[in-house]
Amino acid sequence: MSLPNHSGSSAFKSFSYIVGTGIKRAAKLSTRNPIEMIVVVLILSSFSYFYLFNLARTSDIFSGTVTRLYPTSVYAPTKDHSFSVVDRTADSTIANNAVKVHLHQIVVSDPKHGVLSRQTLASVLRFQQMAENEIYVPDSTAVNRFAFNKDLCYKTTLPSSYSSHSSDSNSNSNLNSKTSPCFAHSPADIWQDEATLLADKNIRSTIEANLDTAKNVFGDLQLNATYASSVTLSYAFNTTGDYREHLADMWKHKVATLPPADLVSLSNIGQQENVFAWLFIVTRNVIFRVKELIDLADNIDIIVILVGYIMMIATFISLYVNMRAMGSRYTLATAVVFNGFFSFMLALLTVRALGVDVYPVVLAEAIPFLAVTIGFERPFKLTKRVFQFSKETPLTKQEIRTTIMRAVDTVALPIARDCFMEIIVLVLGAKSGISGLEEFCLLSAILLAYDFIIMFTWYTAVLALKLELLRIREINGISADDIKKGTKKSTGYIRRTVIKAFSDDHAAGANTANQKADGPIIGRVKLLMIVGFVVMHIFKFCSAFQSVGPQVNITEPSIAVVLDQLLEQHKASSQASLPLFVQVFPAMPFHVATVNKSFVPDAITRPLEALFDTYAVYIQHPVISKWLTIALFVSLFLNTYLFNVAKQPKQIVEQVNQDKKITNAIESTNNTHIEVTEKQKPTIQSPGPVVSSAVVMSPNHKRSHNHHHSHSHSHNHHSNHHQSDIVRPIDECVALVRTPEMLNDEEVISLVENGKMASYALEKVLGDLQRAVGIRRALISRASITKTLEASALPLENYHYDKVMGACCENVIGYMPIPVGVAGPMNIDGDLIHIPMATTEGCLVASTARGCKAINAGGGASTIVIADGMTRGPCVEFPTILRAAACKLWIENEGNDIVTNAFNSTSRFARLRKLKIALAGKLVFIRFSTTTGDAMGMNMISKGCEKALSIITEHFPDMQIISLSGNYCTDKKPAAINWIEGRGKSVVTEAVIPGAIVEKVLKTTVAALVELNISKNLIGSAMAGSVGGFNAHAANILTAIYLATGQDPAQNVESSNCITLMKAVNDTKDLHISCTMPSIEVGTIGGGTILPPQQSMLDMLGVRGPHPTEPGKNAQRLARIICAAVMAGELSLCAALAAGHLVKAHMAHNRGTQAPTITSGPAPSTGTEPGTCIKS
């Protein structure tokens, strides 16, 4: 018998270990990042608040009604000729094949003037026409929509094929197809339409002629005075089936919330009444609702609820008193209350998501019992233990995180145990099947779970901030004890008595033994209270949570006559053999619109009304409310960031002072140890010619020195990483891995070299990107043959590594500066644009600038984008060539739209424009050509291709995907298909240069240029078998602009496809030049364009980021600029070749200065001017 006990004990220990570990991790995360945790919980609670507020706005609390009526259900079995009232929850008494009908009524009232005026009756008839024929449900246009007269109404003669009357599917598809009249009861029974009414000369006589109908339609009818206070419209809905019932409810909601017109719904009374009237209505409804509930309840119910509210108030008072006794006046007690409030909102939202309706009556009765039984004992216990541990030593000498974690360790498992047992009891109550009790127990169980989670996350973060504030007070000389002493001196006798009555004897913290003894007793008492509460309701000792409100009075003439007519017509129909079940719903009140008069001046009410209307719109709107929450999220995180930045300088000064004290102490006591350490430290010597002898410094010391100076500018919070030269043992360093700021650089290097830390993960582990790059650089340098990288001239500091990580490069050891020159400005399509070019080739920028000057003198360049489509060419395989051919034909014909729709569904910007399919044996190559907005688009189109291939696989299951990229694109490789079909942006540019400019600026003639272009660019390239290379040096200019603007340099292979054409025009006096580039692959978002230097160049061109109104226009503009710049470079180089200036210019420019030897100091001036390039 011992084995089972041992197994059960082991299982319990395992469960306790899992729960304890989870609590510790949550608490550790909260204490490490308290502000972030508070922000996250506030955001979740904000989402819950917006949703619940929108839900409350639709409640009748906000409408003009005072008393809430519940529907009355009546049932007529097959043989009965009258209705009998049935319980609305007793579904078992209703036959499965019963015809179900909902009866909704609209009551239009005007007690002051009556409703028998011609104008009012005309408004009612117009309203009836609109309600029956113009209100469609549901709102979505993506599904079939239905109106009352055509689809929703109950028709006395249903189709003869009617069967399976309770089937949802039958109800959805068999919406009344015959044109039999709908059942409705209204003034239209007297006047057919508005025209008939207006033609009626004597309304009183007409009513007398139809007196029986009029008595049931008009309320308080007085013929002698031609007066009636109200008019009733009755509508019967066929709700046989859940879908029909849902449609009827939607129709009712849309009618009840119609905007004010001639008739105003009391549900929308706030839209017509002023703000003060609306607030008065809400207050009045709440008061009358409470009075109604008190009248309906038994005396014992009232006593139980009243005692519950008194105990709830006492619980709140006790909480504040006990927290004040521990040293927190209002902060922690308010935080505990908010902890419970957040849990309550999240629990209510969860219960709503589970499809359980919790009525306001249940909530009103449940809140005091929730506050008392669940209470605030758990957060109070945690707070008390935290303050006990914080008083063991001065706060200035404590690690706040450690103090809170000690407290969590001692109380976590007892709290979890009590909470778990209470949840089990409440879950059993939720399974009891008693209406009201089920909802209460389910809500309580979920609330307990949320309260437990939020306490060890949000409230723990609040405790961490509270202790930090107390520590700051102690540093400034003000302790919590001093505050408590100051408050106790002024406490009177009565106040002390009240505080003693509501306070916990051990709130200030006595001995631990007593607390351990009291803790289980409190938990057991609470558990017994919950058990007793559930048992009391199961055995019906009291009826709270089960009271049923007043129902619709079906004996009123306006309802009774309608029910009799409904039953009579049903018995005369083809479905007389079926039972009839009718639910009579409360009437929807409307009143005739009147001019409002208020005792409050318009100057006050109008601004308040505008404010409330704006608030209602933004809070109720399903999209705007989410964006408001996101804006709150961003705002809170920005404030968090700024708060951290604001408090850093003070912390740094304190840390520096402490470091100085520690350093002085070490130097005064351990000088011998430090000298030995320095002697033992190895020195790495670099080859002589590389390092200058002007400064003698070891590489390690130099790196630390540089790293220190860089951190003083951009990483102040890590300035003390490597101030100590003592390298601790590896085991001690491993223990400090989670606090990398405590390790110096040499210790991190030793961890990597010993396999305790991955080199590629340095950024993630250290949290300081620049420090990680420097350490990786040292590691690679020491492992290399030459060992020169660590002290090399490759820059390290002041770079945006946060933009690089995870996007542009891995295993970063620095960055490579490339000089950026500017050609131009160049007149491109009427705009003067400076062209940035990053290059190390001398003469390139100057040559392009000369071409710009010549083109500008001729009126500038004109460009046009003739095609835009990034491509991807996956490769798939079939078992036979017949299946491959069948796939090709299917994609080119009926499958084209299917594939296109699947592709386009993956992105807002990617749009499939063209498909080109080729076969090679059993292999099929599909070339997708797609517009991708302002992105270059390779990732975007790859995602679309995957989706399209999955759709093709559904039609061809035997298809096998070989590769998502089958080199049929073709990307980063020379290919004729890009030259012929195009890829990316296909651009053409042209310019006309006068002959005089050719001779003056370019130093040659038009004839010489034309002849050179034909011989070199056309015939020469053809002789070489070139594909797309009919140009002089298009790749030169394109790649320079690519590097400057963050494009993919490897794509210059296909992007440089260009044909340059020159022709003598205007009687051979002027030169016409054009460049055609069919495959320029560029983007202005993503990739290297996220780096700030590259973004600055895009800013200079005016094409950074996505275009605000026309997606893709910025990327097309960049392609136009590149093509025009290529034309300028082509023109200048061809002119230099024609004039024989090329060699002279390159010799002068590239050999003008001698490259200096790298030294640790600034390079001395050579005193020579750089060489000149092609002169104009």
From Swiss-Prot:
Biased composition (Basic residues): 700-721
E.C. number(s) listed in UniProt: 1.1.1.34
Record domain SSD: where: 301-465
Classification via Pfam families: HMG-CoA_red (PF00368), Sterol-sensing (PF12349)
Ligand binding (CoA): S847, T848, A849, R850, G851, C852, K853, V1001, L1002, K1003, A1145, H1146
Catalytic reaction annotation: (R)-mevalonate + 2 NADP(+) + CoA = (3S)-3-hydroxy-3-methylglutaryl-CoA + 2 NADPH + 2 H(+)
TM regions (residue ranges): 35-55, 300-320, 331-351, 356-376, 423-443, 445-465, 525-545, 623-643
Domain of life the protein comes from: Eukaryota
The name this protein goes by in its record: 3-hydroxy-3-methylglutaryl-coenzyme A reductase
